[in-house]
A protein has these predicted regions:
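Cationic, low-complexity basic patches in intrinsically disordered or flexible, solvent-exposed regions
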Residues: 157
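A glycine-rich helix N-cap at a beta->alpha junction
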Residues: 83-93
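Structural motif
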Residues: 63-65, 89, 144
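Conserved phosphate-binding/catalytic loop of the ribokinase/pfkB sugar-kinase fold
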Residues: 91-92, 102-140, 145
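Conserved small/polar residues in nucleotide/adenosyl-binding loops
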Residues: 147-154
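Glycine-rich phosphate/adenosyl-contacting loop at the front of the ribokinase-like
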Residues: 1-65, 70-74, 80-84
Length: 158
């Protein structure tokens, strides 16, 4: 595998999320609407690492999973703008793209969060084994711990 300029490249194995953060302007009142602001951003440990590698000028592939929903389109468009290559990402047509929702209190501390990351379970050893050629050609591979690439198993999949 090589990129269009035949430069050394990195592969990041990990998740990508749509992060939705809500911050209350006043102390939170349980079981009530709280005035505040809501912001949407892209996150996920794998995506964040890939983003920073691109900022350093490193051609980077992200091995991740996205669903067949509108959130996947947001992920793909953002990664394209950043130069993160998703051409080898796992697409799960009936899956939900990972989404993380958190509510922060008026002091900026997280009060509660919900993580819909079930799609990360699709990042299996078989999926990574199917990417062997890409992984073998990489100058560097970064694997986030929940991606089933445990240290004692790595040689079997990479």
């Amino acid at each position: 595998m090589s990129n269009e300029k035949n430069l050394p490249y990195a592969v990041v194995c990990g998740g990508v999320n749509i992060d939705i953060g809500a911050h209350s302007f006043a102390p939170l009142r349980a079981k009530d609407s709280n005035p505040g602001k809501v912001e949407l951003s892209l996150g996920g440990v794998g995506r964040n690492i890939a983003h920073n590698m691109r900022l350093l000028g490193v051609p980077t592939y992200l091995l991740t999973a996205v669903g067949g929903d509108s959130r996947a389109s947001q992920v793909e468009e953002s990664c394209k703008e950043l130069g993160i290559d998703l051409s080898h990402a796992l697409r799960v047509p009936d899956g939900r793209t990972s989404t993380y929702v958190f509510v922060g209190d008026s002091d900026g501390d997280m009060a509660v969060a919900v993580a819909d990351m079930e799609i990360c379970e699709k990042l299996t050893p078989d999926y990574f084994a199917s990417q062997k050629e890409l992984l073998d050609g990489a100058a560097a591979v970064v694997a986030v711990s929940y991606t089933h690439l445990r240290a004692h198993e790595t040689d079997q999949y990479l």
